[in-house]
């Protein structure tokens, strides 16, 4: 749910500021990351005893000087009691910047670690197929198979040993 709301705010920022100023906006918003990482700051944002205006002012103090549209953005978030969405808005802005640059993250899930040469070959082949720049990261799990996901493009490719065996059994049973 938070992601959907953050996506709307990020989209509004992109429309208000334009694609060319996204990087500087993201940098400005990321100035609050350390504060959002503290429990005391989170408690202050969640506290019903502190006014929305004061919460907004505290966040603005953490962020420092910014242009009028960004200051108004923070005031709107404070007014709607959604200041805790700032880290999520940052993630959505990062995705938007990556999409304009045609850069995406792919996650390869396997049981065993692949060597760098194999990972690079997979990355290059997939990048060529998708006509995009990819950064491939590997994730190890207890999973008998291979799964490759590029979430932002909606691409998922998997091969599971268990599914292969089940499909083979069904095929043999249908043959008789």
Swiss-Prot record:
It is found in: Cell inner membrane. InterPro entries: ATP_synth_OSCP/delta_N_sf, ATPase_OSCP/dsu. One of its GO terms (cellular component) is plasma membrane. One of its GO terms (molecular function) is proton-transporting ATP synthase activity, rotational mechanism. It comes from the Bacteria. Keywords: ATP synthesis, Cell inner membrane, Cell membrane, CF(1), Hydrogen ion transport, Ion transport, Membrane, Transport. The keyword Transferase does not apply. It is a peripheral membrane protein. F-type ATPases have 2 components, F(1) - the catalytic core - and F(0) - the membrane proton channel. F(1) has five subunits: alpha(3), beta(3), gamma(1), delta(1), epsilon(1). F(0) has three main subunits: a(1), b(2) and c(10-14). The alpha and beta chains form an alternating ring which encloses part of the gamma chain. F(1) is attached to F(0) by a central stalk formed by the gamma and epsilon chains, while a peripheral stalk is formed by the delta and b chains. F(1)F(0) ATP synthase produces ATP from ADP in the presence of a proton or sodium gradient. F-type ATPases consist of two structural domains, F(1) containing the extramembraneous catalytic core and F(0) containing the membrane proton channel, linked together by a central stalk and a peripheral stalk. During catalysis, ATP synthesis in the catalytic domain of F(1) is coupled via a rotary mechanism of the central stalk subunits to proton translocation. Belongs to the ATPase delta chain family. This is ATP synthase subunit delta. It comes from Wolinella succinogenes (strain ATCC 29543 / DSM 1740 / CCUG 13145 / JCM 31913 / LMG 7466 / NCTC 11488 / FDC 602W).
